[in-house]
Amino acid sequence: MATRLEEVTRGRGGGTEEASEGGRGGRRRSPPQKFEIGTMEEARICGLGVKADMVCNSQANDILQHQDPSCGGTTKKHSLEGDEGSDFITKNRNLVSSVFCTQEKREEIPGREARTGPPDGQQDSECSRNKEKTLGKEVLLLMQALNTLSTPEEKLAALCKKYADLLEESRNVQKQMKILQKKQAQIVKEKVHLQSEHSKAILARSKLESLCRELQRHNKTLKEENMQQAREEEERRKEATAHFQITLNEIQAQLEQHDIHNAKLRQENIELGEKLKKLIEQYALREEHIDKVFKHKELQQQLVDAKLQQTTQLIKEADEKHQREREFLLKEATESRHKYEQMKQQEVQLKQQLSLYMDKFEEFQTTMAKSNELFTTFRQEMEKMTKKIKKLEKETIIWRTKWENNNKALLQMAEEKTVRDKEYKAFQIKLERLEKLCRALQTERNELNEKVEVLKEQVSIKAADGDLVSPATQPCAVLDSFKETSRRTLGMHLEARAKSVCEKSAAQKPSSSGSPAQGIESVD
């Protein structure tokens, strides 16, 4: 039977594998990994549904085959259990399929990825075909396994085992579902956190972009100003060159006109040449200065760009440091709270100790004031007092040793007292029992006395007759003897109990020995 059940479970596993392969074949065309994970989960869920349908069909077939008149009650009972199990499995299957559908929708909606696999109708038809195939195979395997069994009880036992296995599998699936739901909640929280961080990064990026735009505008304004200055300088240079050419033309005209004054004007020409050289040198120096200014501006722009990159990197590093410092500060805050609570408790304890020490210090101050008064009044007797103090210290040491010994003795006495209290309680219980016995004996004695009085009255009535004088004396004597024997036995019993109680109470304390004697006297 075990081998048949193993074959059935293997066939069931094969059916689930085929269903999973069919599901994978339906989604294998799509390139992303999300669809492959979805097909795996869908194949698992299809396998669970196939298992549940297989169990329901097998239980229904078994109930229809073995519904004999002799075991009608048992079959009804098992059929009800099978219906409940099938309802439970179908509910779990619907739950799993609904959760899977919601997860698949959540995975597919944000990405908006194009599906290359077959449509949903074809997938449903393929799943239904796979289910029918696996159901047919598992039903055939179950029927073969159940036909091998001889009695219906064995078949029911096999079905019960199979039902228990399916219940365990469904519970495991529920546990996995709970774990997956928790993971999904964690992932959603992480997603929200990442979205918030992303929004913060976007805001920082927008701020940096605005700063960069402002810097670019500033650079553009600087470039325009530099260009305007260069244009103005070029215009000035052109005006100077034009003016210089005009002056040269005038000089040439004057030279042509004043050939006579060449000798006189040579010196002036030399001076003018020197001035021109100076002007040319100044112009060259100005051009070099302008080139240097342009180069300096370009270097400044490069430096600004490098500084921007450095600032972006520094901002990123500052954000990371800020996060680290925040985590570190949170940890320090929790630790400081714990330390604060501990310090509060220590403060309360120290305040209590301070109050005690203050009381002791006040007592000490009072004693010191008294000792100061005594010191002022008895300075002459200080030497004697020192000797007495030494003696008293020795005596205090002796008294301390005695006190310690007395404490030990007190502890021993307390232990003995607890033992004696227990014994006293036991004796009280025994005394209560003795009192109950005495009361019972007294009631019996009273009853016997009443009976004796009744018998005496009867004997006196009979003695009134003359014929029965001699036999009447005999029962009276018998009654008197019976009375005396009963009294003697009661007295002996009570004396023995009283002696035992007195002996035990004599070993106890006088307080505990007084109460049992009073109880005995009250009983007497």
UniProtKB/Swiss-Prot annotation:
Entries under InterPro entries matching the protein: Taxilin_fam
Keyword Coiled coil: yes
Modification type Phosphoserine: residues: S79, S86, S97, S512
Induction: By LPS.
Coiled-coil portions: 153-465
Sites of Omega-N-methylarginine modification: R12, R24
Aminoacyl-tRNA synthetase is among the record's keywords: no
Free-text function comment from the UniProt entry: May be involved in intracellular vesicle traffic. Inhibits ATF4-mediated transcription, possibly by dimerizing with ATF4 to form inactive dimers that cannot bind DNA. May be involved in regulating bone mass density through an ATF4-dependent pathway. May be involved in cell cycle progression.
Subunit structure: Binds to the C-terminal coiled coil region of syntaxin family members STX1A, STX3A and STX4A. Forms a heterodimer with ATF4 in osteoblasts.
Name of the featured protein: Gamma-taxilin
Organism of origin: Mus musculus (Mouse)
Taxonomic path: Eukaryota, Metazoa, Chordata, Craniata, Vertebrata
Gene name of the encoded protein: Txlng
